[in-house]
């Protein structure tokens, strides 16, 4: 599979160009240098052919901080792995000394290079490309990523580089996992440790990740896509427009995921902000795993079995609304307890896709009501005629979580306390570990005295 890396100095429009070429907004775009930090990957297709595009951060050579060095290393790896380079420059500012440094860097890597002169926002500005011939590369394209000018011609060039024709897509459908938590909880470190390479920038400075970066791995032959997100900060700390946009993309990643990994700094413990993040997961009705990271830094060392048990009790006490979520204690740095982590992931993924036949559901609820009759409400007792599970082929249940419709005599006859009892009995029978359950109580046609036109939805 041909890989093309988009490279250039900061703020020349690489991420906007990447989004244009991919046909959707993947990389975060903001008018500030240094927004992109990790390598962002997208597979683009045309007439059955595929090419992988890689967006990179702004390339600079004066790496005075550890974070800057990490960013440089990420870009260097992207260049090494690429078959071809799109070298993006800014047509409005013209040729700068840093552009010449980058050109020298790319020549030393012995890579095929196409120069893309961006920000030529009006037809007829192609003459601005002339000075970039001094970079020493033969192919030069004039584009405006902002106004979609020259993009089709550039795509033609990209697919002429030898895109592969594939019967099966390179990125097979997979379970999408949003990896969320506070800044510096160890989200990127955990993903890097799982895949065995420094795919994501890791630094002690909170807020290193800006984009929601997707990384694919297989676990026992099952494909998963991890979405590494920016750490969610307190609202009063979202002072800049960029941080607000980053936070919004993180919430969006939760909504489009199938499952959430909630990473908590085990050394700091669960904070008020962690509880607010847990509330976002609950509100989104997402299957979830809670992962207590950095257990290698705890003074009170626990063996892993004891740690998992104590971690579960601690999370249930602090985050009772996520009581359905399994808890795993890990060390991303030391790669501790990864076997339990991945086996739990496989189990939760299976549970979220579980299907219970209508006849079994109906039998369960009718037997439970006969054995444990519900309390009367205004002289009426709840009756469940039959129950069914909603689902679609994708496996999300037509909903973020397993969803059930119960056809009853009167939805108003169900008390919340009795529903909690029913759910406890239900989980003992069918489990659904790691999954919230969504219940829709619907009046059966021709049953009962009143007619309700909407479902009564109670969920946990």
Swiss-Prot record:
Keyword terms, alphabetized: GTP-binding, Nucleotide-binding, Repeat, Ribosome biogenesis
Residues reported in the UniProt entry to bind GTP 1: 8-15, 55-59, 118-121
InterPro entries recorded: G_ENGA, GTP-bd, GTPase_Der, KH_dom-like, KH_dom-like_a/b, P-loop_NTPase, Small_GTP-bd
Residues binding GTP 2, per UniProt: 181-188, 228-232, 293-296
Ranges where the EngA-type G domain occurs: 2-166, 175-353
CDD domains: EngA1, EngA2
Family: Belongs to the TRAFAC class TrmE-Era-EngA-EngB-Septin-like GTPase superfamily. EngA (Der) GTPase family.
Primary role: GTPase that plays an essential role in the late steps of ribosome biogenesis.
Name by which UniProt lists this protein: GTPase Der
Organism encoding this protein: Methylacidiphilum infernorum (isolate V4)
